[in-house]
Amino acid sequence: MDSHYGDIEGKDRAEEGLARQSLEIKVSSEPLTPANPVEQEPEPKPEPEPTQGREPESETQPVSDSSKAKDSEGIDYAHVEVPESPGAAETAGEAVSREPESLPQTQPKTKPESKEPEDKDEDEDEDEDEDEDEDEDEDEDEDEGEERDRPEKPKGKGKREKRKESRFRPSLPLTTIVEEGAAPGPQAAKEKARESLKKRDSEEIEGTDRERHKSTEEQLHPGEAKEEEKQKGASTEEFEWTADMQKLQEQQLRGELVEQYHSLLVERNRYQRYNMYLQQKIHETLRKKGLEAAAEPGDKSAEPESPEKEQAYLRYLAMLEELKKQEADDLEWYRQEVRELKQQCQEKQTRVEKEWRRFQALKKQVVMQVMGSCRTRGGRQAALREVEQLQALEDKKEKEMSAVRLENVQLKQSLVHFETRMKAQEDLAEGLLLIDFEQLKIENQTFNEKVEERNEELLKLRTKVTSNVQIITHVKEKLSFIDTENSCKKAQLSEVDAQVALGRDLLTKTKQARDSLRIDNVKLSQKCGLLGKESLLRDLEEKVEKTEMLNRRLESLKRHHAGLALSCKGVKQKIREAKTFLPS
């Protein structure tokens, strides 16, 4: 009966978790388009989603903030739809900028340390962060059914909640925020938180009464303590199952969040590059307008627009700085929340392990007492070994059961997710299913025609392939024949090369003999003179005859000249003598 009760209780807890996740899926499954505005969200989210609150701000965040973003791996990035264009980014920003208003909707709870005097605003913010962390931790404890000791409720709960709402409320007019749709969200969340707190108070009171009743019954009826211990063992077994399941769920969720974190980092870098590109375009346009204004001083139409544009630019810069500050505050708050949740999870795990060890020790003690009373064969050592084997087998079966239950819960969650998506698609496509069916039939016919055409083309290609295969085989045969012929030609070429080499050697030797004979011929021709040269000899004879004739003529001319010279001298003598006889 106890195990059956534990199974029913585990199923109820799984259904509560699935219902909570269905709310998140229902909100995130709606497309962020102008056709589906933000007012259509049916219910506010009970849990904060940090990514939706700061997705638009990450577009203008500098690159140096990436080191800060890496520290927040545990932040829930689920159900974030990144817009593909700047227009889609604006619409997504309109839808997402409303999410931080629903963050402080849960009822805060303070720790005993928060009773110290708050002197600074920073201390107050830290206390508020701790209150929010404890509140979310209490929601998880309600699902597990654990009983805890809680401090008293703080008196300034509403005041801190208002501060948290004012800190997360986007007060900047960057995007159009629909406040009418988000107005009833905090009230419903507050009512839900109050109901959960009342339920926890009643459970704690029942737990304390149950413990007192058990203590009194143990004092009055010590024999019934063993049965109660067995029931307690079954409940701790169920508690161990829920803790293992929660641990596996947290590990799986952490892996998914890390993957989403890396994908969002890539998107953030892309938007940063796009932001730099837009800033460069703005700079170029402003510079061009400045050059045009300097080139055309007479045109004063652009002068009244420049102050307005400067004011708008400064206003947007101030908005950007405020958004960055708000993002830094939100990031610090989420980091603090993650640290607190990790610490609480570690405490839960240690407490669960401690209780499980104590429960195993108690079972071991009870079994040893029972087996000792039965006086089993082998004595105490054999009984101890048998008990250890049974406990090891029990641990193995518990692990297998927890894994199977976790898989069952995951399948149920995926089923709910798909059902919500199908319902959303049916709501969107209501009234258009018949038209879609007709269009699909037409498309199916066109696709069938295309398939037939493709089949015909495939047959043609197959015939071409067969013909090409035959051609390739023929070419291969011809290639092999040409290879053999080429090898024969290469052998012949090698023989011809050898003959050419021998001929070259003979040619060099004959050239050397020719050169030597030519030199000898030149020497002999120099020695023999005009021997064997008839033309030269004839010419020489003619020249000799001409020289002899010219020499004879020269001798005759010399004699004639000498006779003329003697006659001239005689004439001159006669003239001189005649002059002497002439009278002066």
From Swiss-Prot:
Swiss-Prot/TrEMBL keywords: Cell projection, Coiled coil, Cytoplasm, Cytoskeleton
Superkingdom of origin: Eukaryota
A Pfam family annotated for this UniProt entry: CCDC113_CCDC96_CC
Subunit structure: Forms a complex with CFAP263; the interaction is required for functional activity in cilia.
The name this protein goes by in its record: Cilia- and flagella-associated protein 184
Location in the cell: Cell projection, Cilium; Cytoplasm, Cytoskeleton, Microtubule organizing center, Centrosome
Region annotation Disordered: where it falls in the sequence: 1-243
Entry coiled-coil feature ranges: 317-470, 530-561
Record GO cellular component, one term: centrosome
Alphabetized InterPro entries for the sequence: CC_domain-Cilium_Assoc, CCDC113/CCDC96_CC
Biased composition annotated in UniProt, kind: Acidic residues: 119-146
Disulfide pairings: none
Function according to Swiss-Prot or TrEMBL: In complex with CFAP263, acts as a regulator of ciliary beating that connects radial spoke 3 (RS3) to the inner dynein arm (IDA) and the nexin-dynein regulatory complex (N-DRC). The complex is positioned parallel to N-DRC and forms a connection between the arch at the base of RS3, the IDA tail and N-DRC.
Membership in a protein family: Belongs to the CFAP184 family.
Segments of skewed composition (Basic and acidic residues): 1-18, 42-57, 67-82, 189-232
